[in-house]
From Swiss-Prot:
Job description of the protein: Part of the ABC transporter complex MetNIQ involved in methionine import. Responsible for energy coupling to the transport system.
Domain of life from the UniProt record: Bacteria
A GO MF term: ATP hydrolysis activity
Keyword list, A-Z: Amino-acid transport, ATP-binding, Cell membrane, Membrane, Nucleotide-binding, Translocase, Transport
SUPFAM superfamilies: ACT-like (SSF55021), P-loop containing nucleoside triphosphate hydrolases (SSF52540)
Disulfide bonding pattern of the chain: none
Enzyme Commission code(s) on record: 7.4.2.11
Organism ancestry: Bacteria, Bacillati, Bacillota, Bacilli, Lactobacillales
Protein name: Methionine import ATP-binding protein MetN
Subcellular location: Cell membrane
Binding site for ATP: G42, Y43, S44, G45, A46, G47, K48, S49
Amino acid sequence: MSNVIIDLKNIDITFTQKRRTIQAVKDVSIQIEKGDIYGIVGYSGAGKSTLVRAINLLQVPTAGKITIGEDVTFENGQVQLTTKELRQKRQTIGMIFQHFNLMAQKTAYENVAFALRHSKLSNEEKDKKIRGLLELVDLADRAENYPAQLSGGQKQRVAIARALANDPEILISDESTSALDPKTTKQILSLLQDLNKKLGLTVVMITHEMQIVKDICNRVAVMQNGQLLEEGSVLDIFSNPQEDLTQEFIETAAGIEDALAKINAQPLVKNLPASALLVQLKYVGSSTDRPLLTEIFKDFGVSGNILYGNVEILGDTPVGELVVVLDGDSDKVIAALKAIENAGVSLRVLKKGAQ
């Protein structure tokens, strides 16, 4: 039995506006497995939200095939389920949004209850479930509060409880932390991770922030102009991006872009000696354990001056990055660069000293 819960094959989504054809999604194929926290990242207009509307059964693709769980939902531009089956399938997918979409005149309790209005549960069972969900998102004491009495993070917790009311297998987060401050964002991401573990929930994160992908996801797809640029494990994508846009996202998340701007403004780098190189090193896994700069000084007499360093854990794997000035005899520096690459460290020369 397949572990794939969302299977998109060659999805096209086309719109016609004022006699103009717009292809919002172009030949996208993605497989998401049960229990994944899967990120779909891209800038505005990349096609992320349009693709999600097809996943949550609100948008019929122009072409391609979508399978949710064991059921083919759309194929070749046609709905493959009856109206009743489609409605039942939608209940297996929960959704949270950037602006919460809570009803202002209803309490937190009533907002969650609204999702159960068609449930066959008794009133007593509904009450137990609603209070259990509010406790699950750490809002048991806020049941009678209205949205205006809640913080942004608390509103999103109510929205999450509401999205879980019908016991979905999949939870889609469409920019759900974009309106939150950094501290609250981390709290919501932590909650989603907990729900993923406790409930076996498959989470799909739609975002334009690679930091969110890095913090919570195990796999990621990068989209641009409706197309899938690259897809893979977060570790693989972060340690070895294949596309310029992906590299741009990663540099933004790591803060390396700002760091490089400051490094390049330093007198040492502005006036880099002829014998020196400014290099960027990327370490993955066990290669982070080696004292490489100590080794190349010992073996080649090449000094390493660290200007920037960062180590993070992606999954269970450490990923490190250094920006260093290597200085020494030219033939020794070349030998040191080869030794670094042979150690499994990715290397990029950022600047050569003035000759």
